[in-house]
Amino acid sequence: MDKSKRPFLKSKRSFRRRLPPIQSGDRIDYRNMSLISRFISEQGKILSRRVNRLTLKQQRLITIAIKQARILSLLPFLNNEKQFERTESTTRTAGLRARNK
């Protein structure tokens, strides 16, 4: 058979199946902070099901647990550290002192 007539065959690459993020022994509970924190972004947002690789039922339970933890103030609603950072800025009184001299 001529090279140009041969059907194109994809090379079979082996791939490792990722472990599920929630094992059968894990309890989805609002008090289980080590489990819940894996499904929250750095900003404090709940990650999507596609990113988490969860089933629909697991994602629903995780979402409810995160919301309960937020209401009970175990988790912050927003995780925005930039808001609390202090930058060196001139205060109003420092500007007045310079003007008075």
From Swiss-Prot:
Q: Which Gene3D superfamilies match?
A: Ribosomal protein S18
Q: Which keywords annotate this record?
A: Chloroplast, Plastid, Ribonucleoprotein, Ribosomal protein, RNA-binding, rRNA-binding
- Disulfide connectivity for this sequence is none
Q: Which InterPro entries match?
A: Ribosomal_bS18, Ribosomal_bS18_CS, Ribosomal_bS18_sf
Q: Give the molecular function GO annotations.
A: small ribosomal subunit rRNA binding; structural constituent of ribosome
Gene Ontology cellular-component annotations: chloroplast; mitochondrial small ribosomal subunit
Compartments, as annotated in UniProt? Plastid, Chloroplast
Biological process GO annotation list?
translation
Its subunit composition reads: Part of the 30S ribosomal subunit.
What family does the Swiss-Prot or TrEMBL record give for this protein? Belongs to the bacterial ribosomal protein bS18 family.
HAMAP family given in the database record: Ribosomal_bS18
Protein name from the UniProt record: Small ribosomal subunit protein bS18c
